[in-house]
């Protein structure tokens, strides 16, 4: 992993809560969260969070969103109820 200590990142509080909701499910089924990149898409009534695994050193990309570090999972969370309404594991 590259040294990124001098890079600043930002996540808005309104998205942080949805990340926590998704992470509570993610940690039961996946590996190390530090091996994933999280993408957030704000829809009208839902938030979509995609947890995409990084590539291990020397690993080549494969079709289907899976690497030796885990597999891609997409969470759809209701803005109103703040509950997961759909989970999609990519193959």
Q: Which residues make up each language-model segment?
A:
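Hydrophobic transmembrane signal anchors and adjacent membrane-proximal interface regions, especially
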Residues: 10-11, 20, 38-40, 61-63, ...
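Short, compact, well-ordered microdomains
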Residues: 67-91
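Short, non-transmembrane alpha-helical segments in secretory-pathway proteins
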Residues: 1-37
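Eukaryotic scaffold repeat domains enriched in small/polar residues
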Residues: 4, 23-30, 39-53, 88-91
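Exposed beta-strand-loop-beta-strand "reactive/processing" segments of non-cytosolic proteins
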Residues: 34-76
